[in-house]
Amino acid sequence: MEKVAVIYWSGTGNTEMMAKYVAEGAKAAGAEADVFSVSDFSQNQLTEYARYALGCPAMGAEELEDSEFQPFYEAVKPALNGKKVALFGSYGWGGGEWMNPWKADAEAAGLVLVAEPLAIENAPDDAGKAACQDLGKALATA
């Protein structure tokens, strides 16, 4: 089974929690999965993995976090063309609309989304945990 990198940025810890659950799901499906905060992941590590879960919460006016995550995403996007990817993140208000332009951008860049992006309001509850694990399983088995 191919290796999965779960890479996230989290301000409150909610998206970090989601990242850990996504990795649990990938591991339960038989994949090797590693979790990284965006600041701890080097672009050079991309070649070590075949599948990627990218997590970022909604920030400001329903957009990706722009000081660390957005620059990272823009830098790695060309290398992820044709790769299997899952998108996830948390939000505190609004309806999670930031995920729609992110999904469209990822698809336009050639990322192969294995499932609908997962947006969870605040911290994941038991249903949110299960949804994160299901996303990880989908990524591992797609």
Listing of model-derived features with the role each one plays in the protein:
Residues E2-K3, N14-M17, Y21-V38, E48-A142:
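FMN-binding flavodoxin-like domain, especially the glycine-rich phosphate-binding loop
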